[in-house]
């Protein structure tokens, strides 16, 4: 009987050949966006501290924020934060019973979360630039 169990286990665990459902992708990206947001808090607090330290510090922070690369990073941070908040609300709505916990409802809510995040990302781009 033990030999049958071993034969039924998956052999190929190459992640490039496994097709994740959209709900798994949404969950993984939620974790990634949380890590990005966590790291970004330190960077943003440093930038805030620099800008509030003195008039020269404010000028330095303004010069840093004037760079296209920094604006792009800021847009990425805001997009990650927006995604994390939107999908976090989705998870809370499922936990509180406001959304069905079926696979179809999960796929639908994940797609809606992606669309809302794209809209918020575009708004963040307008805000940054």
From Swiss-Prot:
Heme binds at residue 84. Signal peptide: none annotated. Residues 1-26, 90-108 are cytoplasmic. Keywords: Cell inner membrane, Cell membrane, Electron transport, Heme, Iron, Membrane, Metal-binding, Transmembrane, Transmembrane helix, Transport, Tricarboxylic acid cycle. Gene3D superfamilies: Fumarate reductase/succinate dehydrogenase, transmembrane subunit. It holds the Pfam family Sdh_cyt. It is found in: Cell inner membrane. Its cofactor is heme. PROSITE patterns: SDH_CYT_1, SDH_CYT_2. GO terms for biological process: aerobic electron transport chain; aerobic respiration; cytochrome complex assembly; tricarboxylic acid cycle. InterPro entries: SQR/QFR_C/D (IPR034804), Succ_DH_cyt_bsu_CS (IPR018495), Succ_DH_cytb556 (IPR014314), SuccDH_FuR_B_TM-su (IPR000701). One of its GO terms (molecular function) is succinate dehydrogenase (quinone) activity. Coiled coil: none annotated. It is a multi-pass membrane protein. Its main location: membrane. The keyword Chloroplast does not apply. The chain crosses the membrane at residues 27-52, 69-89, 109-129. Pathway: Carbohydrate metabolism; tricarboxylic acid cycle. His-84 provides an axial ligand to heme b556 in the wild-type enzyme. The retention of low spin heme b556 in the SdhC 'Leu-84' mutant suggests that swapping of the heme axial ligand by His-91 or His-30 is possible. Belongs to the cytochrome b560 family. This is Succinate dehydrogenase cytochrome b556 subunit. The gene is sdhC.
